[in-house]
């Protein structure tokens, strides 16, 4: 039998005082199974369960670029029994992108940042695309025709490529899919030639990394240039974090944050996240809340400047 650590046991005792003995914590992942966020959730779930001292059960609620599952959290009771593990799109982008968003980013209660990696522009090795210059040249030959995939309308892949298109004054054809899992499969089948998504897909599927939307080159792809090296101020991190329902008592949020910190320090989680290509980056609840505000403001400006907001 595996015993709880002293720290985890302390959290379990505190949690027991504020939740029914039979309570489970439901972890909503607002994306289909098999995508990057789902992989992270299944890597951390066993250790997070131990750290919380109560069973954490994953439930995938995909659709509408993550907003269906996120809206479910916003409507949840503030009793600590529902949390959300999500990548950034439904939090930092969709409330500014949608004509009638079902929630505001500031309604969610930030718990912790779990992982962060640079968005990576990738393509199969058979397309002949090697550089950003290759993409620009093709787009200029047939304006509006060159397709690219994304994990959904208004997702980071969509916004990143919008920023790239604006920087070079080109038009491309956006083909949205239901999460990164579906979009990479479409690319592998030849439906679309490129995708901007999490970097781990490059090694997983033997793809070519064209560029990273980051301040510095990735240690995993030291030969791949950043957009900044090409004179473009396009820095778009792909981050994943945990949130809980609006109005959840601070004591509960603090305990979730403590459990998150311990989970991300656990050797098996570090090993699994590294192997899966999802670099851990922990921010506590206060730091993460400030980070989310800054990210939401950044993407709100890009959406305004690009005229991307959905019409009523």
Report the location of each language-model feature.
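Stable alpha-helical elements in mature extracytoplasmic
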Residues: 36, 40, 44, 65, ...
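Short alpha-helical functional segments enriched in proximate histidine and acidic residues
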Residues: 51, 263, 295, 302
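N-terminal (or domain-start) structured segment
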Residues: 20-107, 145, 153, 168-205, ...
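Hinge/capping helix and adjacent helix->loop/strand transition within the periplasmic-binding protein
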Residues: 25, 48, 75-81, 88, ...
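Bacterial N-terminal signal peptides
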Residues: 7-18
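Positively charged n-region of N-terminal signal peptides that target proteins for export
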Residues: 1-6
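Short beta-strand->loop
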Residues: 103-113, 171-175, 199-202, 206-235, ...
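Mature extracytoplasmic/periplasmic domains
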Residues: 265, 270-289
């Amino acid at each position: 039998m595996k015993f709880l650590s002293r720290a985890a046991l302390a959290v379990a005792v505190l949690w027991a005082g504020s939740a029914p003995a039979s309570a489970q914590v439901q972890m909503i992942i607002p994306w289909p199974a098999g995508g990057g966020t789902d992989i992270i959730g299944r890597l951390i779930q066993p250790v997070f369960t131990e750290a919380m001292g109560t069973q954490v059960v994953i439930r995938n609620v995909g659709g509408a670029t993550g907003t269906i599952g996120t809206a479910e959290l916003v409507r949840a009771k503030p009793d600590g029994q529902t949390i959300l593990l999500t990548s950034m799109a439904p939090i930092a982008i969709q409330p500014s992108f949608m004509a009638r968003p079902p929630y505001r980013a500031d309604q969610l209660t930030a718990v912790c940042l779990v992982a962060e990696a640079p968005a990576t522009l990738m393509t199969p090795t058979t397309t002949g695309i090697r550089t950003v210059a290759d993409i620009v040249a093709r787009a200029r030959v047939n304006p509006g025709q060159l397709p690219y995939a994304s994990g959904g309308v208004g997702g980071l892949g969509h916004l990143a490529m919008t920023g790239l298109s604006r920087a070079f004054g080109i038009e491309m054809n956006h083909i949205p899919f239901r999460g990164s899992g579906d979009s990479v499969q479409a690319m592998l089948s030849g439906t679309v030639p490129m995708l901007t998504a999490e970097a781990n897909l490059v090694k997983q599927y033997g793809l070519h990394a064209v560029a990273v939307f980051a301040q510095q080159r990735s240690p995993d792809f030291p030969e791949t240039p950043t957009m900044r090296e090409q004179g473009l101020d396009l820095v778009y991190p792909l981050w994943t974090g945990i949130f809980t329902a609006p109005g959840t008592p601070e004591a509960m949020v603090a305990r979730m944050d403590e459990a998150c910190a311990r989970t991300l320090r656990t050797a098996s989680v570090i090993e699994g996240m590294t192997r899966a290509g999802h670099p851990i980056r922990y921010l506590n609840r206060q730091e993460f809340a400030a980070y989310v505000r800054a990210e939401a403001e950044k993407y709100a400006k890009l959406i305004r400047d690009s005229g991307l907001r959905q019409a009523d």
